[in-house]
Amino acid sequence: MRQAGATGALAFGAPGLAVGEGLQNQPDALNTPKTESQAAEKYAHPPGVFINRPLTQVSRMAEALLDDMAGRNSDFFFNEASPRSGLVRDRAPVVGRSLSRVSSIAATGFGLSALCIAAKYNYLRPLDCEQRVEKTLAFLLEECPHEHGFLYHFIDIDSGQRLFGSELSSIDTALLLCGVLLCRQYFTGNTRIEALATTFYRRINWQWMMNGGTTLSMGWLPDQGFLKNRWDIYSELTTMYLLAIGSPTHPVPPEAWDAVQRPVVSYGGIDYISGAAPLFIHQYPHAWCDYRNLRDRHANYFTNSIAATRAHQLWCLVQGQKFPWIDQDMWGISASDSRQGYRVWGGPPSIGPLDGTLVPCAAAGSLVFLPAECSHVLLTMRERFGDRLYGRYGFADAFQPKVGWYGDDVIGIDVGIGMLMAENLRSGFVWECFMKNREIAHAMREVAFHPDPDANTQVL
């Protein structure tokens, strides 16, 4: 479906830097550290240095790869969506036709965002993207089942009906809403898209999802009511809370922002705020919302995610003692497929059991934090494993090179986080467009975001 004239295959023979060239002070692959402290000493930059790298510092080969990825990712979000509803499949096979009827509302949020990128760069015909967005928003608002504006986590791709007994999900509805609001700002000449997007946002009753507490519930089930767990510990929740606080119709109090616990953890001499969850929790908040050079009463969340990514890199290098293919050239583990099915794994702290599987979206979703390192990882994966790992929709979800296992599928949210972060690395387009939403600006004022005088992250 890629439009004729859009960027085609990777030009790996084109003039540019070889893999690894341009990366400063690359460590010796044969001298991998055995402990956390050794890893910190060998790989960690001095305090503050690793947050001073411009996002433009990637090789021309990396730029070509990211451009090619974006085109392939665009194909996923267009081809693997229902022509009737616009809902996006949760996953699709690397090779062959998908017959799955399972849609993820989070993947649909990433998909709406992908259509903006695809239209901007002509990866797809802009009119096709605009029409698909309009159809999707109309379906979400007029046909898709909901309660108080919240949608079920997994739904039928054509009817929108609930699947698997899944919950009304607050976080997944928020990820969907991010895509909706990005489309509102990008397709500004389409008054119907603007009206549908605004009405969709206004319908969501965030106050109801508080369920009488000080923080948002994780969800609701028709037969059981609200889930016991709440969004009360730091994770991917930050942009969701901004959407809730900035709601034009059902805002939650700004105090909900401060009610979230922000535990500080330390790894390899790096201190950062984190919950005990995989790397994606430090990626998703930054896909749409631009936190650079800003802080609230607690932290600068962009530099916090840089620190978390650096700690993850160090942790991966320690895992290389058990899995020697994990080194400074190839690292990154987040929730993904595995030979035994879907796994929520990663670290630090270690969440497993680990089996040496690597996850491309761990690096792709961290491109804005460690641009040179993460783009180098993606180039290495593509060059070493070629078509076994990199296909029509980009990278397979995960792979284990020792046993020669390459995932059969791509997963929508993993494709999406890599695509959006790559675009923010390349141009800042998603950030710039999304931050035009007045509700986000209002929410950031409400929770006291202000310029960080100590920030060293002016990157674009």
Label every model-predicted segment.
Residues 11, 23, 29, 42-43, ...:
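Generic N-terminal simple sequence motifs
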Residues 3-4, 25-27, 39, 46:
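Positively charged, low-complexity intrinsically disordered regions
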Residues 9, 34-37:
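Serine/threonine-rich, low-complexity intrinsically disordered segments
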Residues 17-34:
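Signal peptide processing junction and immediate N-terminal pro/mature segment
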Residues 1-20:
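N-terminal export signals
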Residues 39-460:
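Ser/Thr/Asn(+Pro)-rich, low-complexity disordered segments
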